[in-house]
Amino acid sequence: MKKLSVSLSGHRTSISIENEFFDALQKIAAIEKRSIAAIIAEIDDTRDGRSNLSSAVRVWVLRRAMRD
């Protein structure tokens, strides 16, 4: 498990995701030349209020992997 702390809208928040999801997120960030924090902020802005941020990140990574 990997715990990440990022600033979103001026406040710090943490997510916990499995190492495999973190590795995939790092690869996507490198390909897109974006920071992990920027990707997580985008995910946070577009998620519905029913899912927690860690789950939303996992789903985003999975959808991205299926797209490619």
What residues fall within each predicted segment?
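Surface-exposed, Lys/Arg-rich phosphate-binding patches that contact polyanionic backbones
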Residues: E20-E32, I36-A38, E42-D45
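A general marker of short, structured functional hotspots
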Residues: I17-E18, A56
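C-terminal structural segments of small proteins and small subunits
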Residues: D45-D68
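Short acidic, gly/pro-rich beta-turn/loop elements at beta-sheet edges
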Residues: S16, L25, R67
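Short Lys/Arg-rich basic patches
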Residues: M1-S16
